[in-house]
């Protein structure tokens, strides 16, 4: 009768005057039903396990297929120098930055895999024309160079600015007259200060053109120059990385779009396809997600439609 004591319905059955045979029969039926239900549950569980297994195998196969496609995809070689936050080497020795992320995603959507190579910025034009690299991609301003390369459309807006030490008595562009300024060679600031065409740019005493962009900060810190000029984003990144406190003048020397540049004789049309992907990445929010990883107020750097 041990089975009766375990039956939750025993009191109900006795109160309704069921005899012992009926109780046994009831218990047998309940157990039989329970066995059947357990059997059904086991079968359902087995089916679910099989389905999950198939799905996991499918995912693994899909991932393996994608990896295989990635290995076999045509390669694009992108050349840039070290220019945080656009292109630099992370603590794991891998290229990273705004341009690296945008280029990787855009080329992936076009079916290419990307290899990033560090170049001497002064050699960029020769390298792309000789085919040593496929394109130049490193916070590269378009304005004034339209006829030198085949360009993508701009994917970001960049301000070229002047920065000075906090204690400097330079507060405006006009205060730069007769001063010494440092710039990276073959950049837009070098062109602007060596051959000024805008009336707001004063005649400076001397322009130091340095190959390594980080040297401009050293020259400013040592007092060799009175000011430096570069992309605002690059200056702010340096200030953040090295805990420096420069003062950036309010007035910019140049506002431009930045893009990727291909050789003028490159007839593959990749720059046009990339431009389409830039539009796509703007619309689906990918551009803002990428830029937000490195810069605050990402939206203001993506207002490319505001460029003249």
Give short role names for the model-derived ranges:
Residues 80-82, 157-164, 240-279, 297-308:
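Periplasmic-binding protein-like
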Residues 64-139, 209, 284:
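Extracytoplasmic small-molecule ligand-binding "clamshell" domains
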Residues 55-58:
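C-terminal motif of bacterial Sec signal peptides marking the signal peptidase cleavage site
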Residues 91, 103-112, 189-210, 239-243:
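Ligand-binding cleft/hinge of the Venus flytrap
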Residues 82-83, 91-94, 140-142, 165-169, ...:
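Short coil/turn segments
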Residues 104, 108, 113-175, 247, ...:
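Acidic, polar ligand-binding/catalytic clefts
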Residues 123-126, 139-148, 192-195, 219-255:
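A ligand-binding cleft/hinge motif common to bilobed small-molecule-binding domains
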Residues 60, 100-109, 170, 174-188, ...:
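Extended ligand-binding regions for polar small-molecule ligands
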């Amino acid at each position: 009768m041990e089975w009766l004591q375990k039956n939750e319905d025993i009191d109900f059955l006795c109160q309704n005057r069921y005899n012992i045979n009926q109780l046994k029969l009831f218990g047998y039926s309940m157990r039989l039903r329970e066995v059947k239900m357990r059997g059904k549950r086991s079968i359902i569980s087995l089916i679910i396990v099989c389905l999950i297994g198939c799905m996991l195998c499918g995912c693994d196969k899909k991932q393996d297929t994608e990896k295989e496609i990635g290995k076999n995809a045509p390669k694009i070689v992108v050349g840039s120098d070290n220019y945080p936050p656009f292109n630099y080497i992370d603590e794991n020795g891998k290229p990273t930055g705004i341009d690296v992320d945008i280029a990787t995603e855009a080329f992936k959507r076009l079916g290419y895999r990307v290899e990033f190579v560090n170049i001497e910025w002064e050699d960029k034009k020769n390298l792309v024309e000789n085919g040593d690299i496929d394109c130049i991609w490193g916070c590269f301003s378009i304005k004034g160079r339209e006829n030198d390369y085949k360009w993508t459309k701009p994917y970001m807006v960049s301000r070229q600015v002047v920065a000075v030490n906090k204690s400097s008595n330079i507060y405006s562009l006009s205060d730069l007259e007769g001063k010494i300024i440092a710039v990276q060679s073959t950049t837009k600031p070098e062109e602007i200060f060596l051959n000024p065409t805008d009336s707001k740019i004063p005649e400076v005493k001397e322009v130091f053109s340095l190959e390594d962009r980080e040297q401009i900060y050293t020259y400013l810190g040592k007092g060799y120059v009175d000011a430096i000029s570069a992309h605002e984003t690059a200056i702010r990144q340096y200030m953040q990385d090295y805990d420096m406190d420069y003062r950036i003048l309010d007035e910019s020397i140049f506002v431009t779009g930045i893009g990727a540049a291909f050789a003028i004789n490159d007839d593959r049309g990749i720059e046009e396809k990339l431009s389409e992907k830039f539009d796509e990445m703007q619309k689906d929010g990918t551009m803002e997600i990428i830029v937000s990883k490195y810069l605050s107020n990402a939206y203001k750097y993506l207002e490319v439609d505001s460029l003249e």
